[in-house]
Amino acid sequence: VPVNVLKRSVLRQLKNKRTEIANSAGLGADCAVFAPFSKGQMVTCVQEGVVELQCENDLAEAEREDLSVMPMRRIFQKCANNLAAAGAEPVAAELVIFLPETVEEPELKALMEEAEKAATDLNIQIIGGQTRVSSAVRQPIATATGYGILSEAAVTQASAGKKLAGQDIIITKWIGLEGTADLAARNREKLLERYPAYLVEEAAAFDRYYSILPEAATAVKSGGCTMHDIS
């Protein structure tokens, strides 16, 4: 994208800061710099998705069936969940967005505002990335690379943890939570023909339970030997 668009609609939307980051990438600076830390380890993960430019219930029929289409906030939540499942505290993310030629600047700005809100809610600093326009894509595609810090205690615990007979398998919240929320949000009108509105809206609102960060932190403190985010 042009430099003025990059400044106005991308970089200016990034406000959340963390002490673990010495410098973010930006104009003329292609690399972010992490502040030195003496204990623990760096953990990283990647989450991708086709990004919605409109609200979920306005999706085209084909998009309703494609679960790779998701709001920007979901990409960040999945990234944070994966880091937390590794026992790490999410601290930073890089965001790459490929845009179709039909996308206007206000839509890009809205995507970045949504990304920044999602990152801020998770206390993640967006430290860099790329924003490109390409005739090869039909819808915005986003990839977030997340970075987390695994504390020294968590490193020791993970290396000592063993899966043994007699251990408990603990599942938090509910199986099918994400799928239920997706189906309800993408098919509101169809579901309202058969079910009461309160039931459909409650199901669609299950997205408020997506975060596993509190449970993951508890598992680390409690000596869990392994974790996995099944979303």
List each model region and its residues.
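Helix-biased detector of long, well-ordered alpha-helical tracts
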Residues: V1-S231
